[in-house]
């Protein structure tokens, strides 16, 4: 069992048979060692009690009811009297029943079994370490081939080398005539190895440091060969693939050395049995039992393993082919338990439903890790859909009233009592239920000094969870500034976010100093800005500044305008005859827009200050309009200049839209605010 106070992380990897035995084995007070599951039974059909040495045995996994053994005797847990701590009749310890959530058992396999994750998953770790094709290793594991066992400093009678098919050997029927049955088995086992045992022998003989050195030497030789012979493209690709394989092989060997994992641990001799509470049998209405699929897969393994034990021990005259066939069945049963369907057709029950194996239980969105460990429900948390909050600051978020009053209810009750708005907790809760006006005022004060954390799954990097200062908003959706969406990889098409309230002072300080959104503007991976306009903001800016498609030359022949005007609406034809209005300042233009005298994208002329005008002296006017008083207008593509008789500039008008004005004013206010903040800092 993992101590939650001592261990804050979890590492998954291969373990030795000794470690599996240490997890599952326990010594009873009378000195008896228990832990091995030898029977494929669960509960007795008459007594409804767990079978001894079965998958739910109370001697191995602990009592079903705290302090009560199989016989029905009772002892107080934690009692310091000299009474025995276990039942001498049934051998069950008087301990808490919660032990059945973490106490494991084991199955002692009659033959070594290859772990299918390391053999069949890509890349195959066993094939990479042994530098052999995966098909050859599969044929060896599933007894399609046999392997000649090298006998050091001893002559071999059959003179076999490498892999061979046992079925087609000429000596298969002739040599047994000269041996007794037991003698031939000893002779055959001396020179022939098959199944996962052959894989294990090769992994035991493997020296990882020699693997690294030999792979490095071959990698260098291939590099020199590729530099000298670079004419054949096919050979270059072949050499490149081999070099990539050697790099993966060296990295894998270094990983095994660094983590102190032995390669032979990828072949199982002991099979762990999960605690019973993780694979329960539940009785439903009508007396029917519902069992976890893992129990049926365990039973299949135990049945086949016990059959193999009988063939190896009780029957001395068992043919070798029958033993190899039974070893293959044990291997397939363990494969189904670990990963059902990895070798093709999955195993199904009587209702044609596929059994759920270990892989199905732990992987995916509904697996043990993502649903139970990473996605478990916690207190002081909520969840809702996100919507855009265009008026929010970067470090703020809008929290719905309904969610806020639940998350901050504890703090709200304390503030109501402290400020004498409520005499006790009951009165405070009644005020909160009635949603009196004073409640919202106190809630705003509480939230003002308390940050919250927003998280969007999957949390693939540290910007997947950020801190914000909450403010109350109407509705039921979380309002979010659009600039922070890239860090969350979120958009406003129905995405949901989780809300967490940091409780301790340390958590609140960490949220304020390290996790606020306005302090996380750069990507932690590459250092590029991550708070940049995306999606909704880009579309909004485009619509804001797009304007009318017709330019100032709309009344003249222009090829681009002629192409764009094919699908113009009737209102655009009316626009050609309508004169564009003039405004002396932006306030008048915005007032006309609010009075619906002009449209959002309708162009107009806006008087501009001379000190803010930048004109190109080489640009020629498109048209020149002369007035009766001698003044004239130089009309350019985007601005208009009114000059006097002496050619002096009287005033300047720019051709713009309401969207451009709004965008310019926002940028101007932002720059002025930045300059003021910078001057205050100096």
From Swiss-Prot:
<dbReference type="GO" id="GO:0009507">
    <property type="term" value="C:chloroplast"/>
</dbReference>
<dbReference type="InterPro" id="IPR000722">
    <property type="entry name" value="RNA_pol_asu"/>
</dbReference>
<dbReference type="InterPro" id="IPR044893">
    <property type="entry name" value="RNA_pol_Rpb1_clamp_domain"/>
</dbReference>
<protein>
    <recommendedName>
        <fullName>DNA-directed RNA polymerase subunit beta'</fullName>
        <ecNumber>2.7.7.6</ecNumber>
    </recommendedName>
</protein>
<keyword id="KW-0804">Transcription</keyword>
<keyword id="KW-0460">Magnesium</keyword>
<dbReference type="GO" id="GO:0006351">
    <property type="term" value="P:DNA-templated transcription"/>
</dbReference>
<dbReference type="GO" id="GO:0003677">
    <property type="term" value="F:DNA binding"/>
</dbReference>
<feature type="binding site">
    <location>
        <position position="491"/>
    </location>
    <ligand>
        <name>Mg(2+)</name>
    </ligand>
</feature>
<feature type="binding site">
    <location>
        <position position="69"/>
    </location>
    <ligand>
        <name>Zn(2+)</name>
    </ligand>
</feature>
<dbReference type="InterPro" id="IPR045867">
    <property type="entry name" value="DNA-dir_RpoC_beta_prime"/>
</dbReference>
<keyword id="KW-0934">Plastid</keyword>
<keyword id="KW-0808">Transferase</keyword>
<dbReference type="InterPro" id="IPR034678">
    <property type="entry name" value="RNApol_RpoC1"/>
</dbReference>
<feature type="binding site">
    <location>
        <position position="87"/>
    </location>
    <ligand>
        <name>Zn(2+)</name>
    </ligand>
</feature>
<keyword id="KW-0862">Zinc</keyword>
<dbReference type="GO" id="GO:0003899">
    <property type="term" value="F:DNA-directed RNA polymerase activity"/>
</dbReference>
<keyword id="KW-0548">Nucleotidyltransferase</keyword>
<dbReference type="GO" id="GO:0000287">
    <property type="term" value="F:magnesium ion binding"/>
</dbReference>
<feature type="binding site">
    <location>
        <position position="71"/>
    </location>
    <ligand>
        <name>Zn(2+)</name>
    </ligand>
</feature>
<comment type="function">
    <text>DNA-dependent RNA polymerase catalyzes the transcription of DNA into RNA using the four ribonucleoside triphosphates as substrates.</text>
</comment>
<dbReference type="Pfam" id="PF00623">
    <property type="entry name" value="RNA_pol_Rpb1_2"/>
</dbReference>
<comment type="subunit">
    <text>In plastids the minimal PEP RNA polymerase catalytic core is composed of four subunits: alpha, beta, beta', and beta''. When a (nuclear-encoded) sigma factor is associated with the core the holoenzyme is formed, which can initiate transcription.</text>
</comment>
<dbReference type="Pfam" id="PF04997">
    <property type="entry name" value="RNA_pol_Rpb1_1"/>
</dbReference>
<comment type="similarity">
    <text>Belongs to the RNA polymerase beta' chain family. RpoC1 subfamily.</text>
</comment>
<feature type="binding site">
    <location>
        <position position="495"/>
    </location>
    <ligand>
        <name>Mg(2+)</name>
    </ligand>
</feature>
<feature type="binding site">
    <location>
        <position position="493"/>
    </location>
    <ligand>
        <name>Mg(2+)</name>
    </ligand>
</feature>
<dbReference type="InterPro" id="IPR007080">
    <property type="entry name" value="RNA_pol_Rpb1_1"/>
</dbReference>
<dbReference type="InterPro" id="IPR042102">
    <property type="entry name" value="RNA_pol_Rpb1_3_sf"/>
</dbReference>
<dbReference type="InterPro" id="IPR006592">
    <property type="entry name" value="RNA_pol_N"/>
</dbReference>
<dbReference type="GO" id="GO:0008270">
    <property type="term" value="F:zinc ion binding"/>
</dbReference>
<keyword id="KW-0150">Chloroplast</keyword>
<dbReference type="GO" id="GO:0005739">
    <property type="term" value="C:mitochondrion"/>
</dbReference>
<keyword id="KW-0479">Metal-binding</keyword>
<feature type="binding site">
    <location>
        <position position="90"/>
    </location>
    <ligand>
        <name>Zn(2+)</name>
    </ligand>
</feature>
<keyword id="KW-0240">DNA-directed RNA polymerase</keyword>
<dbReference type="GO" id="GO:0000428">
    <property type="term" value="C:DNA-directed RNA polymerase complex"/>
</dbReference>
